[in-house]
Structure formats: structure tokens, C-alpha cells
Amino acid sequence: MCGIVGFTGRHQAAPILLDGLSKLEYRGYDSAGIAVRDGEKDIEIIKAKGRLKVLLEKTNAGESVPGMCGIGHTRWATHGEPSEVNAHPHVSDNGNVAAVHNGIIENYQELKEKLLRRGYSFYSSTDTEVAVKLVDYYYQKYGGSPVEAVRHAMVRIRGSYALVMMF
């Protein structure tokens, strides 16, 4: 079962996100990842296949990842094999939108085909990446309004899910 954590505040986000993910380890997972934003800089994505220990080592327990806002995820594969590429978070092609997700997007293939026709690229075999790119499409279409982008995307996504986005 997937686990989702998020943090925004006055402290470094990565160690807090990793601590939150460690509290979800009992649920089982095949990969984990975090996305952290440091002010106006691009969102930094760090992922690892396997145990959370691998992600902790890659990030020096989060200490090497600056930023005070982030999201994290432990994944139990439902679409796509367990791999670093399929691990969450996923990010839009331009890096503006990152997301973690739990659940199933039933119409992800249909949405993916529409986005491919609009020039989007896909690197994973997850339904989550489709959701990120769909939100990004509406984010660009509606002049950079996160609320409008999410609202328009949610009307089109069918399934049972939780989705946490970071802009």
C-alpha cells in the first residue's frame, strides 16, 4: 500500500519527509521518493528502488537536500514494475508540477493517448505520471493557476485515489 507525506514550514523538509515515510514502512512498499523545493529553484526529485534505507543513503538522511517544502511517497506497484523510474514523485516535463499518488486512475491510458497527441513525453509506466502531465497541461492552459489546473484535471480523471501536488 502506498504512503504519502507532505511538509511546508520553517525547517528543512527532506529530513521531516523521510521521518514521515519511515513511520509508514510497516505498510510495505517497493520504492520511495521525495520532491523538495528550495525557494524559487526547480523542484528536486530523489527516488530509490527498494527499502527506505536506500533513499536515506542517497540523501544523507535528507541533510543534502535543501528546501522547506516537499512531498514524499512509498510505492506499492499497481501500474508498472517496481523501479526507480516508476517510483514517485513524478514531475511534469518542464518541472513546474510534481505529484505523489495513491490509488488507481481507471482512464489513464485514454488520458495518456490524448497527452501524447499534444506532445507530452512519458518515461514511466505509471498512472501517476499521466495525472501530473494532465494537471500541467491545464496549468499552462489557464495561465499558471494551480487551483484551476487541478480543478479541470479532476473532472477528467476517473478512479479512486489520493493525489498530492506541488507547484
Which role fits each region the language model picked out?
Residues M1-F167:
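Conserved short alpha-helical segments that host acidic/polar catalytic motifs at enzyme active sites
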